[in-house]
Amino acid sequence: MRCAASRVAGIVLAGLAAGALGPVAAFAAPTTPPAASGGTSAADLKSDGPTQPAKVQDGQYTDKNGDPTYHVTDSGKKVDWYTMSGYLRYNANCIVCHGPDGMGSTYAPSLVDALKGMDYAHFAGIIVGGKNDVNAAQELVMPAFGDNRNVMCYMPDIYTYLRARSDGALGRNRPPEHEPKPAAFEKAEDACMK
């Protein structure tokens, strides 16, 4: 099952990398992105939390493995656009089962805890194919969202937000500030939602 989920996640990742990455307008105040002036320095990539971005392209930060990651600064008060987008999409699609801020509920587990040992490919595999893990001790069942554009078009963003929460780089509640929405995000969002 894990191999099939990883293959599906790889296909999804390839599609997302080809242009389907973004989310919806946020209400927090936008601020200038660190790499807006052109080149990216090590100081531009410095982030709160244990996971440090290795690269930023079109406002999307990635770690050394190429997985989407957060750029949180100012003691958790300022986030990149994709983390903000993930917050918005999480609250539109995931909060019903997984509770506020990814903390879990009586109905579904904490995603803050689950992401501590989960890479993006595994996360994507569960989102695309769902989960059905039933045994005597527990019943973990999640529907597949592979055909839901409101989730699939924003999957990297949701992962980025939950990763920031899991790493302790972002606290509970809405981030007060965010970097501006990149033009590449809008283009990818439009292409994905068609």
Question: Can you describe what each PLM-predicted range is?
Answer:
Residues M1-V12:
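Bacterial N-terminal signal peptides that target proteins for export
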Residues A4, I95-H98, M193:
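Secreted/luminal cysteine- and crosslink-motif detector
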Residues L16-A26:
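C-terminal segment of classical bacterial N-terminal signal peptides
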Residues A29-V72, D80, L88, A137-K194:
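Flexible coil segments in periplasmic/lumen-exposed cytochrome c-class electron-transfer proteins
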Residues V79-P100, G125-G129:
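Sequence/structural segment immediately N-terminal to covalent heme-attachment motifs in c-type
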Residues N93-C94, H98, L115, G130-V134, ...:
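Sec/Tat-exported extracytoplasmic proteins
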Residues D101-G129, A144-N148:
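Gly/Gly-Pro-rich "capping" loops immediately C-terminal to redox-active cysteine motifs
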